[in-house]
């Protein structure tokens, strides 16, 4: 038999990953594509999702604010890809970033540390990448039929709350119980 080396992933409390995905909804009977913001806390496996008409600076901010309210606090460190909403320029062969003014304001207001993935290395935030797919398949299938985005977002937030009641395989508590450790970190 062949042995394969592996590394157990260690997930620290108080860390988050952010990404956007896209899905189809029926808004007043019309099929529309929406952007959805996802913030994941890998330690507790807690997730927050909100849908917006598009991905832009305002929805990036609003997604953060709503997620912080839902989680009951601000993660100490958040990992991102190199979204133009946060990064205006990648410098020194990808080792440094020039941040947008809007992102610097968000960061200085909420006082979290940031981390950006290496260019074309989405696997560095693999938890949220996987969750974007999970959310698309489990929250947006079948295609939600809603009168407005407020109703959709209320439904998405309710689903996120329901997810907190689930127990993670190999863990002794629910996601909500592990979220308490995330909050204290």
What is the predicted function of each stretch?
Residues 80-82, 93-94, 114-136, 152:
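RNase H-like two-metal-ion nuclease catalytic core shared by retroviral integrases
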